[in-house]
Amino acid sequence: MNFLKKVNLEQFSDPFQLEDILSYVDSLSPKDTAAKAAVDIALHDLVGKLLGAPWHKIWGLNKEKTPSTTFTIGIDTPDVVRAKTKECADRFNILKVKLGRDNDKEMIETIRSVTDLPIAIDANQGWKDRQYALDMIHWLKEKGIVMIEQPMPKEQLDDIAWVTLQSPLPVFADESL
């Protein structure tokens, strides 16, 4: 939030000056990439709305040939997860689900009651024991999961390596990088 407090766009009267605005935003800090991305996305969304067209049309892209992206379902109650899944299931080809709590299996069963779309998992470093992580990955594979992101705490590099070697699914690092 501190980064966003630095952003003052009053000097720009035209939101279509995307390159100038985003260069200014980028110059405010060498880091804060998530906050910069939020400004970038909001600005592009505004311009798209002003033009009355989605960006794939503005850029002349064929939506059917555009690479897929995921819709992320965060950690929440089963009712909220069910509602979010229903909301996005017909608009995305793959879901990304945040796990790493005691009710992980319940969350997956809730999603599976709504859709059979492929699912990528981000365990958010939530599985502390490597055998538990591996057991979860085997169970998740049976549920149509296609990949696992950051299953264990980033400090447990040896355990992450062990899980990665044993896993029937691809395992990716995030916080470990």
Indicate residue ranges for each PLM-predicted region:
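Conserved active-site and cofactor/substrate-binding residues in soluble primary-metabolism enzymes
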Residues: 16, 20, 30, 34, ...
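Active-site beta->alpha loop and helix N-cap motifs at the rims of alpha/beta catalytic domains
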Residues: 49, 53, 63-97, 101-105
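Catalytic core of soluble alpha/beta enzymes
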Residues: 97, 102-177
